[in-house]
């Protein structure tokens, strides 16, 4: 078991910037905490593994799969591996990215 207390406090929102910090590398998952100032964005990109996006504070616009949705605190979005997506901060905030290494998880499943 690994505990990351008060994860939101690990990265401050910086003026006119996007900041990222890996806060956990664990078995089957990696957590990256991002902070964004208003108007900052991650242009369209992909991830090699499935990911979960969770807004910790602030408001984000997520575009993927020909859809655009707002991501607010308490919301979670799942994106499949290699799905092109982008992130835009509509207000200052922090976003937690969970990268799920399904290959590693599959290796952990018992075989019968």
Question: Whereabouts are the PLM-identified features?
Answer:
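Short acidic-glycine-tyrosine-enriched beta hairpin
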Residues: 66-81
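Structural motif
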Residues: 30, 59-61, 68, 84, ...
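A short, N-terminal "cap"/entry segment at the start of jelly-roll beta-barrel domains
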Residues: 1-28, 63, 111-112
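A cytosolic small-molecule/anion-sensing beta-strand core signal
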Residues: 56-57, 72-73, 91
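Conserved short histidine dyad/triad with adjacent acidic residue
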Residues: 17, 30-47
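Ligand-binding loop in jelly-roll beta-barrel domains
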Residues: 81-105
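Short, conserved beta-strand element in jelly-roll/cupin
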Residues: 35-37, 47-62
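Short beta-strand His + acidic residue motifs that chelate non-heme Fe in jelly-roll/DSBH
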Residues: 42-44, 62-63, 79, 84-90
């Amino acid at each position: 078991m690994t505990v990351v207390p008060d994860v939101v406090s690990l990265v401050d929102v910086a003026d006119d910037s996007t900041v990222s910090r890996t806060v956990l590398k664990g078995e089957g998952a990696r957590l990256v905490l991002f902070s964004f100032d208003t108007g900052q964005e991650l242009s369209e990109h992909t991830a090699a593994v499935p990911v979960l996006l969770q807004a910790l504070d602030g408001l984000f616009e997520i575009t993927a799969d020909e859809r655009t949705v707002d991501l607010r605190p308490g919301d979670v979005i799942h994106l499949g591996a290699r799905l092109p997506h982008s992130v835009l901060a509509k207000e200052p905030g922090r976003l937690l990215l969970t990268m799920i290494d399904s290959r590693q998880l599959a290796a952990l499943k018992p075989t019968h």
